A protein has these predicted regions:
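Transmembrane alpha-helical segments of multi-pass small-molecule transport proteins
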Residues: 19-23, 142-149, 173-198, 217, ...
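Transmembrane helix-loop junctions in multi-pass membrane proteins
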Residues: 17, 31-36, 75-79, 88, ...
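Flexible loop linkers connecting adjacent transmembrane helices
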Residues: 34-59, 81-83, 87-88, 103-136, ...
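Extracellular/periplasmic helix-exit of transmembrane alpha-helices
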Residues: 29, 107-116, 120, 221-239, ...
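Hydrophobic transmembrane alpha-helices that form the core helical bundles
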Residues: 85, 94-98, 102-135, 139-175, ...
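Alpha-helical membrane segments and immediately flanking helix-loop junctions
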Residues: 53-85, 111-129, 133, 150, ...
Length: 468
């Protein structure tokens, strides 16, 4: 099974997704005139705005939910795996994917805001399934995407998050492969159940507290480790760029190259263009759709350019030998141990627990939004939600028992299939988001707090929001 999954993953990323991801990202980067760079400062301003009157789901809350999913085990275990298998050059290609991918993230999240729906309780919700159905008018494709997202996030990604949390404990002497994974999986499953049975409001409360705390603590310790290894920093950068452009090594073994691993782990970590973050973006109450496009663009930068980069620099500045035998969380633990000693193990484990748990919670939010889509205008039966949440908790338990290659390949394949649907869709619908961006920039130049009406960009169909 492991060999089959590996072959599928390699084919998917070698021949299809690498072209789509970079191609679509570059297309939107150029079409928006480098918007991720031009409007970076504006994205920081927008995220601090209060929600629109009558709503309590702010841009900051939406940022925390999407960042909870983006900022997870991929920022530690994923980056370490990419470096262990693809070399230091994988870091450079993660940066590339984040820069061009931020443009895709802007487009998909702006579209999610334009086509968001209003619940009977007055809350907004939406995502790719909704803009596929409403803008493309393809209910069949929308259902396929919703099912793909549920399987990917509640299944593949949460299996992988649980696996990586379990891996963080494997370095301890008391760890026993025969029964410890069952204990860790069981505890994670119970914690997951306690969170998700409280509903999406509780999820946003949990992530709004945990995400900033875990990110700040991890960054602070990472910066200390890098500072203590300052003598190795010049060699570290030399290694990153030399490995990134070693084309002989790249094309002689593309499946395990820096490019491939950088793209895989970069996509797994920042999710730009995959179609996940728009589900959080649609929930925010803002005066203009572009505001959430900017916020989700910022989330990509926080994830890759800040947190993933800190992990990479911790590993590469430590000057430990990277052979490929040691990968994932144990590699980060060994790198940190060169400067902070025995504190490295408990700290990395604690970080992975927080990163992993918020990933589980954020992923489930996306899955539940798409489950509700499958029931259309009808309320999702309570018994269905109960079974759905119970299955999600059981899958978290099962993830701790998986093998390394099986866990990562399942996540990569399912994520790739989602991107194969969402990327062509946002190319088709992208002009609407680009016109929306021009409308926003024009109002900002006039000194206004931008507001939006769908008719100003040529949308005449009936929407739940943005009507005259």
């Amino acid at each position: 099974m492991s060999a089959i999954l590996d072959a599928i993953s390699t084919a998917l990323y070698s021949y299809i997704l690498i072209i789509l991801l970079i191609g679509v990202g570059l297309y939107f980067f150029i079409r928006t005139k480098a918007l991720p760079l031009r409007m970076f400062g504006e994205s920081i301003r927008v995220v601090m705005e209060k929600p629109e009157k009558g709503s309590d789901f702010s841009s900051f809350r939406a940022l925390m939910v999407s960042t909870a999913s983006r900022v997870g085990v991929g920022n530690i275990a994923g980056v370490a795996t990419a470096i262990a298998l693809g070399g230091a050059g994988a870091v450079f290609w993660m940066w590339v994917i984040a820069t061009v991918g931020a443009a895709s993230a802007f487009i998909e999240s702006t579209l999610a805001q334009i086509y968001k729906h209003r619940s009977p309780h007055g809350h907004s919700f939406g995502g790719p399934a909704y803009y596929i159905k409403d803008a493309l008018r393809s209910k069949t494709l929308a259902i396929i995407f919703a099912v793909a997202l549920i399987v990917t996030y509640m299944g593949g990604f949460n299996l992988l998050a649980s696996f990586n949390v379990n891996q963080a404990f494997s370095a301890y002497s008391w760890y026993n492969a025969s029964y410890t994974p069952y204990i860790i999986g069981g505890l994670l499953g119970l914690a997951m159940a306690g969170s998700i049975f409280g509903g999406t409001r509780r999820l946003s409360d949990i992530t709004g507290i945990l995400v900033p705390i875990m990110a700040i603590i991890y960054l602070a310790v990472g910066i200390v480790v890098i500072a203590l290894n300052w003598r190795n920093i010049p060699a570290m950068f030399e290694s990153i760029f030399a490995s990134a452009f070693d084309f002989k090594a790249i094309f002689s073994g593309f499946a395990g190259s820096a490019v491939m691993l950088g793209i895989k782990r970069g996509l797994y970590s920042n999710e730009a263009g995959v179609g996940s973050a728009p589900n959080a973006a649609a929930s925010a109450s803002v005066s203009h759709p572009v505001k959430q496009g900017l916020v989700q663009m910022l989330s990509v930068f926080i994830d890759t350019m800040v947190i993933c980069t800190i992990t990479a620099f911790v590993i590469l500045s430590s000057n430990i030998e990277i052979t490929g035998d040691l990968k994932g969380a144990p590699l980060v633990q060994n790198a940190m141990a060169t400067t902070i000693g025995s504190f490295a193990g408990p700290f990395t484990t604690f970080a992975l627990l927080l990163f992993g748990f918020t990933t589980l919670v954020g992923n489930f939010y996306y899955a539940e939004v798409n489950l509700r889509f499958l029931f259309g205008d009808k309320p999702t039966p309570h018994w269905v939600l109960t079974i759905f949440r119970a299955v999600a908790s059981l899958l978290v338990f099962a993830g701790a028992l998986l093998e390394f290659s099986v866990a990562w390949n399942i996540g990569d394949i399912l994520m790739g299939l989602m991107a194969l649907i969402n990327l062509p869709v946002i190319v088709i619908l992208g002009n609407k988001a680009i016109r929306c961006a021009k409308d926003y920039q024009m109002q900002r130049k006039q000194g206004l707090n931008p507001s939006f009406r769908a008719s100003t960009i040529g949308i005449t169909q009936k929407l739940d929001y943005w009507q005259d």
